[in-house]
């Protein structure tokens, strides 16, 4: 494995993560519009914006795969749209609306965990707005359970990132050592 293939691997990982994130948001928001969990309101503007933005970004990224889309910015934007959707819908439900809030929070956490299993920043930016919206809308009820649901994936992704960084450092060190030994052997064969 060369340094060039190493960089290509990370670029491909970035593209797949972005595409998966956009696809999961598109599917989840489409399902929220077509078959809503609680039928108090079927259509919300933020949910329609998520469908439109994720669909357009998916098409754009498919057409021009070399152009970079800033994942933290997109994840924060989608996180804020999801939080807006949750608040809009929760305000129309009759209290207690804890069941809806927990299901909405878990849905957003699943999207973030699946798409950003190697990017804690993007996961946090995507999930934090909805988490805060759910805490506020729950009015202090079940805050410990919601905090646990939010912190568990953060801990898992952080541990996975630590393990992955150690593995990457070991692999990179091994590759550098092999390249150095190859250069040494080439120098010796020249003599």
Language-model-detected regions and their locations in the chain:
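Select subsegments of transmembrane alpha-helices in polytopic membrane proteins
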Residues: 16-23, 117-124
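Short helix-perturbing small/polar motifs within transmembrane alpha-helices
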Residues: 108-120, 154-165
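Short, Lys/Arg-rich, polar N-terminal cytosolic tail immediately upstream
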Residues: 1-10
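Juxtamembrane or sensor-core-proximal signal-transducing alpha helices
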Residues: 149-182
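Central hydrophobic cores of alpha-helical transmembrane segments
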Residues: 77-78, 120-135, 150
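Hydrophobic transmembrane alpha-helices and their membrane-interface boundaries in multi-pass
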Residues: 20-110, 129-131
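PAS/LOV and related PAS-like sensory modules
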Residues: 183-191
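Transmembrane helix interruption/hinge and helix-loop junction motifs
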Residues: 37-42, 95, 115-122, 137-145
